[in-house]
């Protein structure tokens, strides 16, 4: 029986591992353990998240809680090493590009386990970004590089570090979750009509720390979107910063509907039925492409190029002229045509399990 350990480092990782767990459960040849790097009382892991995703809660919480990326790395390595003493794994699956992800990857390789990286090959090509360092380290160590698209697949293949590692373009596992839950989405109690609101999400620390740029973004949204409500489900620092900025603006911000996060299935409904999405999140941009909803990304880059080249996403960075132009197109219904990238078919988890068991 193949023993598989799945490591989640933050809330978004659970959205991607839930289909993996279903696929493993459907196999008679593998068992899994789900490990979370953080604390059991982590406020971002509301009970409704696991209920909405129809997945079990983690088997173990490593209990790491720090704002220092280096401290997180050290603490996760030590705690995960102790965990593997009692629960040896044949394969360790890590997700995305967090410090905790890198720490688990290093520990797994030192313990002699096979390492699989889910969403491998994503690059910003900015080595000053901590996540870019994490990606390079994880991919270099991985035995199985599971990529989501053509561009990331070519990057992972080109950078492959050893003959024993293999790259597989398995597709975008986020689509497995979206397709599975599409019929289960719930409309939030916000008095909204389909296609008659905008969705705003903000999370990137650099953007939130630049108060002048954030003020310009909020002002531009108010000035160019008429009477359309703007729903903004935010967490922690993003919530505090945006609420403060809105109260200090010289114009009315009453059109903003700011909420302290929102359950997963309700957020899925908001993404699927918005007139448009404004975000700094690659995952949210992917959801918008899946739903054929116009999306503006407030970054100069995206690790998910297919959302731009094939999908509904455009990049504006911090250029207010580009933001105004994109919002005008969004409001006027003049958005570009989009399609689904290759292998966004909802079968990614199935492919991964087949590869791991072959």
Regions found by a protein language model. Name each.
Residues 27-33, 113, 226-230:
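A generic structural motif
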